[in-house]
Amino acid sequence: MNNATFNYTNVNPISHIRGSAIITICVSFTVILTVFGYIAKIFINKKNCTNNVIGLRERIKCSGCEPFCNKRDDISSPRAGVDIPSFILPGLNLSESTPN
């Protein structure tokens, strides 16, 4: 009744190391691209602080383009949350909703 034991002597260590290296390279590449994309986004936003994308509300220019910018009309409360384009949720108006 020794059928449940596994024999790992036939595992090729070269293929195991190669597979681990490929996974490590892929994860590292993804992390590096994410970091460079974030840095590039910061530099692009410093040059053009207003997002003039069709369907989205224009944002005011902020000093340093911090992520919590104020709305154009309301300068009392900081921005929080994510802008939802109008073409994704056409029947939902989140900015004007008030609790009952």
Curated annotation (Swiss-Prot):
One of its GO terms (biological process) is proton transmembrane transport. It comes from the Viruses. GO terms for molecular function: channel activity. Residues 1-18 are virion surface. Its main location: virion. The chain crosses the membrane at residues 19-40. Pfam families: NB. InterPro entries: InfluenzaB_glycoprotein_NB. Disulfide bonds: none annotated. Residues 41-100 are intravirion. It is found in: Virion membrane. Glycans are attached at N3, N7. It is a single-pass type III membrane protein. Putative viral proton channel. May play a role in virus entry. This is Glycoprotein NB. It comes from Influenza B virus (strain B/Hong Kong/8/1973). The gene is NB.
